[in-house]
Design a protein with these regions (language model features):
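N-terminal, positively charged, Ser/Thr/Ala/Gly-biased leader segments
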Residues: 1-40
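Oxyanion/phosphate-interacting regions
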Residues: 1-15, 180, 197-336
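Residue-level signal for inorganic ion chemistry
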Residues: 24, 49, 60, 94, ...
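Short secondary-structure junctions
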Residues: 32-37, 142, 182-189, 231-232, ...
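N-terminal assembly/interaction segments in proteins that build large macromolecular machines
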Residues: 33-86
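DPxDG-like acidic metal-binding loop motif
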Residues: 80-139, 143
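Phosphate/pyrophosphate- and phosphate-bearing ligand-binding catalytic cores of soluble enzymes
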Residues: 149-225
Length: 336
């Protein structure tokens, strides 16, 4: 692959992510129209998501008309099997965004035949209007703006360090070899892309996700790898872990990419291997049974009769297993 072309892709992805981040910040902590993808109000979409994705799609299509696009909010582009595909999550962490918490990301991952080759993630700053772009290209290192990034170097989890796990981790996972007591300070921040960025800079020693979707991790996976780390995945519940080097066989279609699912653990190489050997995921059947039982006895409703959120989810963000009625956006409100 032409190195100059790859540098251009990274540079453009960085500017596109910065532009999407600026759009998000224009809507942050302001009244927003909110729609929900499911009847239980667990998967919100805002006008900010849609405007950011439209900006990214327009920018990519203008600069790379022969590249494909896979986005969370809209359909794939018409390119069926493009050499390059841009995988977009315009706003990962929508619930945080809606509640005024600056813990979200706008994520871009660029794939060549399914292999990540460039990434750019906008991460907001604590101060209003601030933010950085975390970016990388294959074999080019990872950076926060101009500062080089590096994962932690501890070969095993350490107490006092931060670890990203899903909010339901105590129920979803079983641990061997005393790992549960040595995971460190567990956090679930509500944005997979944000947690992977924090892992790439060493603020998190590692992070783990149950079944994220491709747009959750396409950018962050390359970021962690280029920061000296390792990202492992497995597609069967307790199958063998292997390095996440690509998201499908050679020349995947955009539909292939959209359908990708897999557990992910990210951190330095020794740490991910250590954790991967000592963690086992429990069956989702138990959680489905518990949900059914709670519904039968009325424990899945609050005092008003409204359904409570299910926490047995698929990742650290707004993607738990759902019971969507298949009708798309079913609820609407304005959040001030």
């Amino acid at each position: 692959m032409d190195e100059a072309f790859l540098e251009r892709v990274e540079r453009d992805a960085t500017e596109f992510a910065r532009g999407a981040g600026a759009l998000l910040l224009e809507h942050f902590r302001r009244p927003l129209d909110v729609q929900y993808k499911s009847a239980d109000r667990r998967d919100p979409v805002t006008e900010a998501d849609k405007k950011a994705e439209a900006f990214l799609r327009d920018s990519i299509s203008a600069s790379y008309p022969d590249h494909g696009i896979v986005g969370e909010e809209d359909e794939n582009t018409e390119h069926e099997t493009p050499e390059f595909a841009w995988v977009l999550d315009p706003l990962d962490g929508t619930t945080n965004f809606l509640n005024g918490l600056p813990v979200f990301a706008s994520s871009i991952g660029v794939l060549r035949r399914g292999v990540p080759v460039a990434a750019a993630l906008f991460i907001p700053g604590i101060e209003p209007g601030g933010g950085s772009v975390y970016h990388a290209r294959l074999n080019g290192g990872a950076f926060q703006d101009d500062r080089r990034l590096a994962v932690t170097d501890n070969p095993q989890p350490e107490r006092g360090r931060l670890t990203g796990f899903p909010s339901f981790w105590l129920r979803m996972y079983a641990f061997n070899g005393g790992l549960r007591q040595r995971l460190g300070e567990v956090r679930s921040l509500g944005s997979i892309a944000f947690e992977m960025a924090m892992t790439s800079r060493g603020s998190f020693q590692m992070c783990m996700f149950t079944t994220p979707k491709i747009w959750d991790v396409a950018g962050g996976a390359l970021l962690v790898n280029e920061a000296g780390g390792k990202v492992l995945t497995r597609t069967r519940r307790n199958g063998a872990w292997h390095p996440l080097e690509g998201f499908r066989p050679d020349a995947p279609t955009l539909d292939n990419l959209r359908e990708w699912r897999g557990a992910v653990v990210a951190g330095n190489e020794a740490l991910t291997a250590h954790v991967g050997q000592r963690v086992r995921q429990r069956s989702f059947a138990w959680f489905r049974f518990r949900r059914w039982l709670r519904q039968k006895v009325g424990l899945n409703q609050d005092a008003t009769g409204a359904p409570l959120s299910n926490t047995a989810g698929a990742g650290n963000t707004e993607h738990p297993p759902t019971s969507s009625n298949g009708t798309g956006l079913t609820q609407r409100e304005t959040r001030s």
